[in-house]
Amino acid sequence: MEPNNSFRVDSEFRYTLFPIFYSIVFVLGVIANSYVLWVFARLYPSKKFNEIKIFMVNLTMADLLFLVTLPLWIVYYYNQGDWILPKFLCNLAGCFFFINTYCSVAFLAVITYNRFQAVTRPIKTAQATTRKRGFLLSLIIWVSIVGAASYFFVLDSTNSEPKKTGSGNITRCFEHYEKGSIPVLIIHIFLVFSFFLVFLIILFCNLVIIRTLLTQQVQMQRNAEVKRRALWMVCTVLAVFVICFVPHHLVQLPWTLAELGFQDTDFHQGINDAHQVTLCLLSTNCVLDPIIYCFLTKKFRKHLTEKLYSMRESRKCSRATSETGTEVVVQLKDAPIKSLKY
């Protein structure tokens, strides 16, 4: 394939979409993930962390790494795609974006496999000492992905482009590919195919879990509740993948080909527009991941339910107090003066 020399396309709607969308994700994500860490620190001593809880904490940390860089991207898109911050922050933002994306995929994969083992081999899983394995797998995931992400620290991440007005230049952040670069294409092919391999494994494990749970005989109400939660957990994990990760990786390879100049201009514009939307969807995993924890741990779910109930009762009390106070004021106002004794 020979690259063409099409002009640089842009999707200008992103300069409105990203600041608004990322601001919402930032607020909700920081609140949700900080609360998750607080609950885990309060409810679970470190010695009682089993494999699944270790994976959950690591997934939360990966989400927070991305969330702390969202203000940088908000400033970038608010300034019409002009990186006005120090260059190293562009490298840092790109690095954390990569870490969050693939650490999230990896930890969701090992969480799914853990649940797969618990359903298909419950006795063996219950007897296994999995705490060390949890730490070891987490270490392998972090070292592998952070090692791969270190590429973004040495990469020349910014480039200058003339403004559309014709006066001066703007600085882009991770928006430049050398036309016809085969190494860049190979890297993206590897990432996309690796993702879909992991996704197929996760899909297989979840389908086996669903089938096993649906074919089991439920003899007790408590077991029925456990089964229902397990099914919801499976559906939530699949939903996170389908909503957040699959659209981005479906678009990523065609978009890369267009960026490298192997597609015509009309296709490039359309796929670039789609790519911006999938980037928004990708960021929502930071908000959706904490939902999975509600179905994975009994203590977490109980603590959250108690807090929500307490807040609801507090509002009822406040409203009742307010209404009682109003009634007293009305009664005093209507009472004869002589009946008021001091």
From Swiss-Prot:
Interacts with ARRB1. It comes from Capra hircus (Goat). Glycans are attached at residues 4, 169. Keywords: Cell membrane, Chemotaxis, Disulfide bond, G-protein coupled receptor, Glycoprotein, Membrane, Receptor, Transducer, Transmembrane, Transmembrane helix. Residues 1-16, 75-91, 156-184, 255-276 are extracellular. Belongs to the G-protein coupled receptor 1 family. Residues 39-54, 114-133, 206-233, 297-342 are cytoplasmic. The chain crosses the membrane at residues 17-38, 55-74, 92-113, 134-155, 185-205, 234-254, 277-296. This is Platelet-activating factor receptor. The gene is PTAFR. Receptor for platelet activating factor, a chemotactic phospholipid mediator that possesses potent inflammatory, smooth-muscle contractile and hypotensive activity. Seems to mediate its action via a G protein that activates a phosphatidylinositol-calcium second messenger system. It is a multi-pass membrane protein. Disulfide bonds join 90-173. InterPro entries: Cit_transptr-like_dom, GPCR_Rhodpsn, GPCR_Rhodpsn_7TM, PAF_rcpt. GO terms for molecular function: G protein-coupled purinergic nucleotide receptor activity; platelet activating factor receptor activity. One of its GO terms (biological process) is chemotaxis.
